[in-house]
Amino acid sequence: MKRLFAWGAPLFALVALTLSLFSQADTKPSTIDSTSANYQQATLAGGCFWCTESDMEKLPGVVDVISGYAGGDVDNPTYKQVSSGKTGHIEVIQVTFDPKIVTYEQVLDNFFRHIDPTDDQGSFVDRGEQYRPAIFYHNAEQLEVAKRFMMEIDQLGIFKKPLKTELIEFKKFWPAEDYHQDYYKKNKVRYNYYRYASGRDQYLDEIFGADRNTHPKTLRQWIDEKNGQANVKAYVRPSDEQIRAKLTSLQYKVTQRDGTERPFDNEYWDNKEEGIYVDIVSGEPLFSSTDKYDSKTGWPSFTQPLNSSYIVTKDDNSLFYTRTEVRSRFADSHLGHVFNDGPAPTGLRYCMNSAAMRFIPKQEMAAQGYGEYLALFK
């Protein structure tokens, strides 16, 4: 599996051996009860389980990730047996997650964004069916979610090739040897060397962009954005005179002069009513109460927009560091900023100004022309 390039092996082995003496002492057994009835499991194959384990453990809502083997004919297989390709097993990770925090689709979303799901002959530098991508579904619901989501990803076309990720009924999981568990923590140098040499990150950068870690975007966001572009309505920006007459001094300062209102002293920071938020100038739909959460900042915060086609982001260098500004597409109103410290499923915090938005309660949405969004509240 982890075949390192010969030219770097001697020096690398010396460094890795030295560091491993120190890193192994840091390994601690998990104190989390991953068998709780409140949790669910996903069993996924995406090539080297050193890498897939590392990537999946970073997803909020994931309780535990164990590297192992599934799908074969031999009980309690060893790594040597599985890597030979003769047992029928595939290298997998078994993911225990809290469905109150992260859904099964969101687990799959994270999984697909860290593998090559189009290669059924292996995974990056590791060749053979024991490294092919697969989803071992635990029940009929997982199967349906996976089939539907994969169809949407194929239609999106982001991978440029058809998905060849196999759907296999889950039967049995065997944990891999202890030294494979949390390998990226215990053997950082060797892991980083292997990961770079495998070509995994280079491939993912090509598909999702070199900023995929600093500005993550889920496949669901890509899909919704593509679908949303087909359903975008044109909104009109009023004249400057009309805007001045319509807005309060604070609303004008925020939207037209890129101002910021005071935290905890604005209209919507603690609004818990169901409904949507639209641009105060043009009325274009921006955010939903279904994506609103308490960020403890004193400003209304959301994990994602209603339709990303209605917002525009740009670099803001007005302070001593670069922020990402959020503006409305048609009115070009300054709305606020987006940060990478939000909760699941997006990991984003759209920190908005109440003064830039108008709230429409759910019961008034149809009458005001926003009935298409009522399905969000069913």
UniProtKB/Swiss-Prot annotation:
Domain of life: Bacteria
Enzymatic reactions: L-methionyl-[protein] + [thioredoxin]-disulfide + H2O = L-methionyl-(S)-S-oxide-[protein] + [thioredoxin]-dithiol; [thioredoxin]-disulfide + L-methionine + H2O = L-methionine (S)-S-oxide + [thioredoxin]-dithiol; L-methionyl-[protein] + [thioredoxin]-disulfide + H2O = L-methionyl-(R)-S-oxide-[protein] + [thioredoxin]-dithiol
Active site: 48, 351 (nucleophile)
One cellular component term from this protein's GO annotations in UniProt: cytoplasm
Keyword field contains Protein transport: no
Gene Ontology biological process terms in this record: protein modification process; protein repair; response to oxidative stress
Name of this protein: Peptide methionine sulfoxide reductase MsrA/MsrB
